[in-house]
């Protein structure tokens, strides 16, 4: 089946979340579970109340079955997010966040909000961070040249969102430069 051109060069948000499912996160199991051999790794025996690192997809599945509580990553603590938001608003550069921060936050907020303290404040702060970063990305695209675009510390979803625009802009810039060099 042929896909529209814009879908050929980027992933859907659902595909990005699927990829984020391979990121590791801490859980606290609610009961003892045997060692679990996976394709990519083996999850050791899980015993409550000891934390265990598992892929996000497994954490969400265990949460759904009430077999574990998800421990939000440190970067999702309200104080750290407030610092990141302030940094995003005060500086022209992007703050350092995990590569799949947006997808991970979306999955955690949608499927285990009851495991997150101050969840509504965290949602609001994450939205502020997202809007500040989108504004910076747009500004970066406006300042583009035909050779490169430097947007360090962008996350996977952010890169995926600007990829179609970036590709089109770069193609047009190359054509303009090529025409001006021919003249």
Swiss-Prot record:
The intrachain disulfides are none
Q: Name one GO cellular component term.
A: cytosol
Q: Which UniProt keywords apply?
A: Chromosome partition, DNA replication, Nucleus
* GO BP, sorted A to Z: chromosome segregation; DNA replication initiation; double-strand break repair via break-induced replication; nuclear DNA replication
Please state where this protein is localized: Nucleus
Q: Which domain of life is it from?
A: Eukaryota
Q: Pfam families given for it? A: PSF2_N (PF25005), Sld5 (PF05916)
The answer to whether keyword Nucleus applies is: yes
Q: Which SUPFAM superfamilies match?
A: GINS helical bundle-like, PriA/YqbF domain
Q: Which PANTHER family match?
A: DNA REPLICATION COMPLEX GINS PROTEIN PSF2
The task this protein performs is described as: The GINS complex plays an essential role in the initiation of DNA replication. Has a role in chromosome segregation and is required for bir1 localization.
Q: Quaternary structure?
A: Component of the GINS complex which is a heterotetramer of sld5, psf1, psf2 and psf3. Interacts with sld5.
Instruction: Return the similarity comment.
Output: Belongs to the GINS2/PSF2 family.
The protein's name in its UniProt record = DNA replication complex GINS protein psf2
Which organism does this record belong to? Answer: Schizosaccharomyces pombe (strain 972 / ATCC 24843) (Fission yeast)
Q: What's the source species' lineage? A: Eukaryota, Fungi, Dikarya, Ascomycota, Taphrinomycotina
Q: What gene is this protein a product of?
A: psf2
């Amino acid at each position: 089946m042929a896909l529209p051109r814009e879908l050929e060069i980027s992933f859907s948000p659902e595909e990005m979340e699927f990829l984020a499912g391979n990121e590791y996160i801490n859980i606290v199991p609610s009961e003892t579970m045997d060692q679990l051999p996976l394709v990519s790794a083996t999850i050791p025996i899980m015993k409550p109340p000891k934390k265990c690192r598992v892929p996000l997809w497994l954490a969400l599945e265990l949460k759904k079955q009430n077999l574990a509580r998800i421990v939000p990553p440190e970067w999702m603590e309200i104080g750290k997010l407030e610092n990141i938001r302030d940094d995003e608003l005060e500086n022209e550069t992007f703050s350092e966040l995990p590569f799949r921060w947006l997808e991970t936050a979306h999955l955690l907020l949608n499927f285990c909000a009851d495991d997150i303290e101050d969840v509504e404040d965290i949602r609001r702060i994450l939205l502020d961070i997202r809007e500040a970063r989108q504004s910076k990305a747009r500004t970066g695209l406006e300042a583009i040249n035909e050779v490169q675009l430097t947007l360090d510390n962008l996350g996977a979803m952010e890169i995926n969102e600007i990829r179609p625009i970036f590709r089109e802009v770069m193609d047009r810039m190359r054509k303009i430069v090529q025409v001006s060099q021919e003249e």
